[in-house]
Amino acid sequence: MSIVVADVDKPAAVEVAGQLADEGVLVADARALPVRVDVASADEVAALGEATMDAFGAVHLVCNNAGVSAGGLSWEVPMSDWQWVMEVNLWGVVYGVRTFVPLIVRSGGGHIVNTASMAGLTSPPFMSPYSVAKHGVVALSEALYHELSFSHPEVGASVLCPGWVRTRIH
């Protein structure tokens, strides 16, 4: 399976694509294509969809996995932090769904995985922007699952809710 590695940090995408090749994850004529994309931009996500189709001709699996965080007392978190977290964590998934579900359908089927968090199932203090966005991802993913089961059963949808994991998220 060929893979598009999309990240707002292009050198990180290039590094991961190289690791996939070095570790033997890519077999036969599969390749990893590193692409810089800011998922907070609907236009950039749409361009990612076009680039994916241009490079590989089909899309069968999408993982919406971008995430950022800001915290503090709900009423003291700067509005710019609220907007940033919502744009990346919720709107980025919405843009991914809107762009890639039609491409998966056109490609004959597949699956979309949206990463939420345990914070999307609970409401931990001092994490309101993150938790609100991840609750939205859970709700969107559950609705998407049912919508696809009726309209396009060849396409599945899942939501991933990991617990605390050491990442580069900030």
Located regions from the model:
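Rossmann-fold cofactor-recognition segment
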Residues: 20-43
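A glycine-rich helix->loop->beta "capping" turn
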Residues: 23, 29-31, 51-62, 70
